[in-house]
Amino acid sequence: MSEDKDYMSEPFIVKKIDDEESLLDDYNPQGNTSFSKTCFHGINALSGVGILSVPYALASGGWLSLIILFTVAITTFYCAILIKRCMEMDPLLRSYPDIGYKAFGNTGRVIVSIFMNLELYLVATSFLILEGDNLNKLFSNVGLNFMGLEFQGKQMFIIMVALIILPSVWLDNMRILSYVSASGVFASGVILASIFSVGAFEGVGFKNNDSEVFRLNGVATSVSLYAFCYCAHPVFPTLYTSMKNKRQFSNVMIICFTICTFIYASVAVLGYLMYGSDVESQITLNLPTDKLSSKVAIWTTLVNPIAKFALMVTPIIDAMRSRFSRVLPNKRASGFLLSTILVTSNVIVALLLPFFGDLMSLVGAFLSASASVILPCLCYLKISGKYQRLGFETLVLIGITLTGIVVVITGTYQAVKDIFGRF
């Protein structure tokens, strides 16, 4: 039971990344986490701020892009099973970087770690943008003058939220925040119910006729945003390792992906029916602020990222502290300094690129598609040895990998183009 509690205290967005020179030692093959708790953790890992962007993704690609959502869900589910197979082939594997190391040596570990850390960094940055957007909607026409510098609306709120979050990043003990961040499971349900309530009972309705069946020029954005919704694969090795009965892991994945896909599809359809092509990159920005259900949705959206921010950046800080341990031998001082520098850089990026939808599209295309689709396929091909013999599954894996590469190239190009187009 104590081991299960220790597991509950770990960040579920991603397991802490070991130093690339570390060996696979001190392995305990017996986990203590039950089936139901693993389902809970899996749903929490899959559910996140992506739920706010799925209506925008649907509006970008049209109604037929729902097929893309289900295709992405099925593909990423299959890639989760590939991760499980890799873990089964070598019981010493405990984390995603370990799988990369097993497949491609230190190069594989470094590549996986870079993708994981960069994804965490940009998602944490998107939290600040999200907070700034929604607080600016609630409290418009608010500004701040500091030492002759004018900070208006969104800029001021981004800085203010960063100052509120910073003390939580300084903490070494993340147990309390880990429990709070688990509210992501309930937050997704609350947001879905609130959006439905706004449409059904508070005057917005579901009869917006400004919608399209298919928009070819928006497909790249749709795929990227949908991919971002399923970017939890770095945590799946941790979930697998923690399970008491690892044979049930596939069933856990079925439940997690089914529930989250239902929620994502429901929010996408409701949001598109309510606002059509006018839907914002965050559905909460469309909601009327004078309605109770809207306030519940917006405040739920605001609280959850604040709790999760520290958990997102802690693995990055730990990796930086390990890298600079000789220069900064004092653990507490180095943690304080590095975490402050990291959060400051998050704020700078958020102020320079304050475009939530475009940033999520970039993360989904470049990082999520790579970490959740391409890397699982390549690692499984190498570890299983299937790359040496041509069969049906090998062809499927090659096809998925090539498709993933196309998504990375086209989605990243479109996201970067959209970002620069806003300046």
UniProtKB/Swiss-Prot annotation:
Keywords: Amino-acid transport, Membrane, Transmembrane, Transmembrane helix, Transport
Subcellular location field: Membrane
Superkingdom to which the source organism belongs: Eukaryota
Record has ATP-binding as a keyword: no
InterPro entries, per the entry: AA_transpt_TM
Main location: membrane
GO cellular component terms attached to this protein's record: organelle membrane
Disulfide bridge map: none
Protein's GO biological process: amino acid transport
Xref: Pfam families: Aa_trans (PF01490)
Membrane topology label: Multi-pass membrane protein
Stretches assigned to coiled coil: none
Chain ranges passing through the membrane: 39-59, 63-83, 110-130, 151-171, 186-206, 219-239, 252-272, 297-317, 333-355, 359-381, 390-410
Family stated for the protein in its record: Belongs to the amino acid/polyamine transporter 2 family. Amino acid/auxin permease (AAAP) (TC 2.A.18.5) subfamily.
Protein name as catalogued: Amino acid transporter AVT1J
Lineage, opening ranks: Eukaryota, Viridiplantae, Streptophyta, Embryophyta, Tracheophyta
